[in-house]
């Protein structure tokens, strides 16, 4: 059990490190702070762990899988931000903190979520995701 927990923590750390570097390279915008708030608000990155496990069966490169996992985490964060909106579930708390729309306003939360979804596609076209890996994934 401890070995699995250590692996989950390593994958979460590696995924967050990639995402932090990727976000840092984004064009300056008022949306960066709410995007980071939704993206780095906790969570175990279980989706990335599942992706790494499946990818390892097909002998995919770990770094490529981290890049794919980062895209998945962006999509997940986007879905949580939008799910919490007043027009959806109207949740004011997410992972023990105010929801993105409560902290930054509804319009900003919508745009931050949309930006995370767009960023996921940008990540999928990342230069370090080798063409041969993309073929294996398809």
Model regions and ranges:
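N-terminal amphipathic/basic leader segments beginning at the initiator methionine
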Residues: 1-23
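Mg2+-dependent prenyl diphosphate-binding active-site environment of isoprenoid biosynthetic enzymes
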Residues: 20-138
